[in-house]
């Protein structure tokens, strides 16, 4: 794991990554936070997504959530990422990777996919695009 992250930092031209007190490595690329957390035999990549339009008071906007989940199902064969709601109800883009099968190039590819999916998802969560998608305009 340490060699993998050391090689990733080198290939990205960065200083070696240092985990926080919870063991999470935080990497910011193109203003997006990618958190890397070792979890047993896996490396979990998580990116919280600011999605205030997903909430309707104390409830979740089911129409928008359904649309997002349908997209996640559609990309499931090509990408290891999925959408999850964390314990606080925040939308998170997550990938679980088997450390045993992971090399630096593979990790970079997954991070690039994570960023590409974020660029696809975030515009859908702006007030204008949400209103037009669910008929609020």
Curated annotation (Swiss-Prot):
* UniProt-listed SUPFAM superfamilies: Type III secretory system chaperone-like (SSF69635)
Give the induction annotation. Answer: At 37 degrees Celsius in the absence of calcium.
Keyword Cell membrane attached? yes
Q: Where's it found, cell-wise?
A: Cytoplasm; Cell inner membrane
A single GO cellular-component term on record = plasma membrane
Q: Describe its function.
A: Functions as a specific chaperone for YopN. It could facilitate the secretion and the subsequent translocation of YopN.
What protein name is recorded for this chain? Answer: Chaperone protein YscB
Lineage, highest ranks first: Bacteria, Pseudomonadati, Pseudomonadota, Gammaproteobacteria, Enterobacterales
Gene (name only): yscB
């Amino acid at each position: 794991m340490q060699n993998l992250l050391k090689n990733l930092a080198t290939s990205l031209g960065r200083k070696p990554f240092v985990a926080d007190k919870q063991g999470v490595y935080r990497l910011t690329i193109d203003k997006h936070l990618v958190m890397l957390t070792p979890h047993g035999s896996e490396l979990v990549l998580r990116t919280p997504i600011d999605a205030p339009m997903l909430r309707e008071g104390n409830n979740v906007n089911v129409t928008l959530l359904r649309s997002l989940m349908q997209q996640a199902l559609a990309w499931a064969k090509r990408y290891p990422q999925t959408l999850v709601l964390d314990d606080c109800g925040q939308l998170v883009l997550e990938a679980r990777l088997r450390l045993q099968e992971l090399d630096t190039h593979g990790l970079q590819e997954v991070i690039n996919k994570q960023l590409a999916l974020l660029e696809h998802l975030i515009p859908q969560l702006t007030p204008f695009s949400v209103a037009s998608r669910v008929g609020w305009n």
